[in-house]
Amino acid sequence: MAIVSGIEIPNNKIGLIALTYIFGIGISTSKRIFKDTGIDENIKVINWSDEDINKIRKYISSNIRIEGELRFEIQLDIKRMIEIGCYRGIRHRIGLPVRGQKTKNNCRTRKGKKKTVANKKKKINK
């Protein structure tokens, strides 16, 4: 397995798909990496030469934020939104969906498990 930026990339995949195993690299970024480095994106990882791997490593380390650095940046952005009290920050703080989804029936991922509320017993008047 080739190791790029501390992540093991599967050998049996083509290069375009294999790079998407790294957090922060999707299909479009992967295509841009192969275009800028001049490597064929349809070659399987097992057939990459050491020179190809080094080109990809250098390009990623100098041009793209990935893994821990990207996660930290996202975390700081969320903290900043919470501190300034914008709408998205408030939604993050109270644990509701941030991007405009309806919350009457769904959004269980953000709200957590259902909390059952006990009903009050009705008094019978005679």
Curated annotation (Swiss-Prot):
Coiled coil: none annotated. PROSITE patterns: RIBOSOMAL_S13_1, RIBOSOMAL_S13_2. InterPro entries: Rbsml_uS13_C, Ribosomal_uS13, Ribosomal_uS13-like_H2TH, Ribosomal_uS13_bac-type, Ribosomal_uS13_CS. Keywords: Ribonucleoprotein, Ribosomal protein, RNA-binding, rRNA-binding, tRNA-binding. GO terms for molecular function: rRNA binding; structural constituent of ribosome; tRNA binding. GO terms for biological process: translation. It comes from the Bacteria. The keyword RNA-binding applies. Residues 101-126 are annotated as: Disordered. The keyword Translocase does not apply. GO terms for cellular component: cytosol; small ribosomal subunit. PANTHER family: 30S RIBOSOMAL PROTEIN S13/40S RIBOSOMAL PROTEIN S18, SMALL RIBOSOMAL SUBUNIT PROTEIN US13M. Belongs to the universal ribosomal protein uS13 family. Located at the top of the head of the 30S subunit, it contacts several helices of the 16S rRNA. In the 70S ribosome it contacts the 23S rRNA (bridge B1a) and protein L5 of the 50S subunit (bridge B1b), connecting the 2 subunits; these bridges are implicated in subunit movement. Contacts the tRNAs in the A and P-sites. Part of the 30S ribosomal subunit. Forms a loose heterodimer with protein S19. Forms two bridges to the 50S subunit in the 70S ribosome. This is Small ribosomal subunit protein uS13.
